[in-house]
Amino acid sequence: MARKKIALVGAGNIGGTLAHLIGLKELGDVVLFDIAEGTPQGKALDIAESTPIEGVDASYSGSNDYAAIKDADVVIVTAGVPRKPGMSRDDLIGINAKVMSAVGQGIRANCPNAFVICITNPLDAMVWVLREVSGLPHNKVVGMAGVLDSARFRYFLSEEFNVSVKDVNAFVLGGHGDTMVPLPRYSTVAGIPLPDLVKMGWTTQEKLDQIIQRTRDGGAEIVGLLKTGSAFYAPAAAAVQMAEAYLKDQKRVLPCAAWVEGQYGLDGIYVGVPTIIGAGGIEKVIEIELNADEKAAFAKSVDSVRGLIAASKELMPK
């Protein structure tokens, strides 16, 4: 059976990290695309030269021509500008909406059957633009946010409880921004919900609230430390997990920015929800029961995403 083809649109820090991880997991051949001449070619060659050391059989190539992504099975989009200190994800909308329009046209022309994962911020709105322009089915275009936000939440909880990250399950609902909604009631350590761990004296509600806020600020914390860009190792790992679930039909339950129509009382919007990812793309949106506080927080997050999508509509090339 021929190897799968994975196209990475954007050869910056995330794109390069994605290419390396995809090779290490032997998910398929990799094409790096970027408008910067030499960058995708150089990174592809560098990673290709590591394959004899790592024992990886995969082809790597770089290009400045969208034709190179033709017939890709998976496309992961990281093109656009990253955050700098003091910026919110939403500040990027003016530039990145135009970038997503160009990328969407490239996908429509070259690989209309691909499963597309978007990482570019402001995430939920950029997924919407990408889907609108590419014309792909909603279940084949998705945003990487929830896996990353949930991973940050899980890591902070594992540090607080001094337990393996493998024993911590947690997930985050809503938009990928300051209004995201970490859900303690649905987050567990070895199956024990966080509210019960507070009652057991493992932590305090105050500490838990601090961890939830740190999760919301997780991206900004890294931007502040790096000063010249944003996170790339964890976002790349999150997108690869989603791509692997699709390519191997794993039916993984993963939170991501998916098209929600009917569930949660929503009438068609991209926002972070738990989903099942398999060979059909987003095969199911899982609708969980929310209490009054969680519903209010989720509604606030949805409103924020709606505002960003409305702004994106104005910015898209006519």
Swiss-Prot record:
Keyword Cytoplasm annotated: no
Gene3D superfamilies: Lactate dehydrogenase/glycoside hydrolase, family 4, C-terminal, NAD(P)-binding Rossmann-like Domain
GO molecular function: L-lactate dehydrogenase activity; L-malate dehydrogenase (NAD+) activity
Catalytic activity, reaction form: (S)-malate + NAD(+) = oxaloacetate + NADH + H(+)
Sorted UniProt keywords: NAD, Oxidoreductase, Tricarboxylic acid cycle
Any single biological process term in GO: lactate metabolic process
UniProt-annotated binding residues for substrate: R83, R89, N121, R152
Pfam families, alphabetized: Ldh_1_C (PF02866), Ldh_1_N (PF00056)
EC assignment: 1.1.1.37
Active-site residues, Swiss-Prot/TrEMBL: H176 (proton acceptor)
InterPro entries associated with the record: L-lactate/malate_DH, Lactate/malate_DH_C, Lactate/malate_DH_N, Lactate_DH/Glyco_Ohase_4_C, Malate_DH_type3, NAD(P)-bd_dom_sf
Positions of NAD(+) binding: G10, A11, G12, N13, I14, G15, D34, N96, I119, T120, N121
Record family assignment: Belongs to the LDH/MDH superfamily. MDH type 3 family.
NCBIfam families for the chain: MalateDH_bact, PRK06223.1
Function: Catalyzes the reversible oxidation of malate to oxaloacetate.
Protein known as: Malate dehydrogenase
Origin organism lineage: Bacteria, Pseudomonadati, Pseudomonadota, Alphaproteobacteria, Rhodospirillales
Gene coding for it: mdh
